[in-house]
Amino acid sequence: MQQYLDLCKHILNNGIKKEDRTGTGTISTFGYQMRFDLQKGFPLLTTKKLHLKSIIHELLWFISGNTNIKYLKDNGVSIWDEWADENGNLGPVYGHQWRSWDTADGRSIDQLKGVIDQIKNNPDSRRLIVSSWNVGEIEKMALPPCHCFYQFYVVNGTLSCMLYQRSADVFIGVPFNIASYALFTMMIAQSCGLRAGEFVHTLGDAHIYLNHVEQVKLQLSRDPRPLPKMNINPDIKDLFQFKYSDFTLTDYDPHPHIKGAVAV
């Protein structure tokens, strides 16, 4: 995935050292965009092996509206462990905002169902938007949303998605985010009778943690390999009916995994 490697090069060549909330330190740039044509393969990084199981289960967890890590733990996914409280709760994070945004007048808005309805019935709308950034509930969240706002675009029978990510951990988080939102776009496209178009990834503070620099350089020394193919069960026409067994990845031939510590 040359787009990702170009991002890494851009940060190493143009980034500025900055302090951060975690105390780790970063090399950071502000404002960057990548585009992925989903008809040209599934954008799962090949310069290091990624744990696709975690990506799929986390996405299904978001879609369900769940904000407790029990489902993730039951399926061998530990990526949210550091932020959960003693009962496994994370507060009103992504899934809650997608499926039950609380309004000031006491109502609850299912943004995800709403945007799917609009894609089907008003595809030319410029309001095909879901936001995770609920200012009134940020302080209740274990971690404010990093990937916080996405918009869909329908043209010529295809569905594209653009994500705005305010904070982008380029070594660990961004490869997961690319694959997750690419798959999400494919799932919604199938649910709406459309083909998947592009995933457009817009980054705000795009950074490499200082303790990841050598790992990023190792990735840059590796040649990217052909992208794999994601096969989705064609019988599922409802986004909320997908399960883990409905996804099969083929032709994935990545370079070996590279370890890196998560900044908490």
UniProtKB/Swiss-Prot annotation:
Matching entries from CDD domains are given as: TS_Pyrimidine_HMase
Q: Name one GO biological process term.
A: dTTP biosynthetic process
Which Pfam families has this protein been placed in? Thymidylat_synt (PF00303)
Chief location of this protein within or outside the cell:
cytoplasm
What does the record give as the active site?
Answer: 146
Domain of life (superkingdom)? Bacteria
Q: Which UniProt keywords apply?
A: Cytoplasm, Methyltransferase, Nucleotide biosynthesis, Transferase
Give this protein's Gene Ontology molecular function annotations. thymidylate synthase activity
Question: What EC number(s) does this enzyme carry?
Answer: 2.1.1.45
Q: Which family does it belong to?
A: Belongs to the thymidylate synthase family. Bacterial-type ThyA subfamily.
Q: Which HAMAP family match?
A: Thymidy_synth_bact
Official protein name in the record: Thymidylate synthase
Q: Which organism is it from?
A: Ruminiclostridium cellulolyticum (strain ATCC 35319 / DSM 5812 / JCM 6584 / H10) (Clostridium cellulolyticum)
Q: What is the lineage of its organism?
A: Bacteria, Bacillati, Bacillota, Clostridia, Eubacteriales
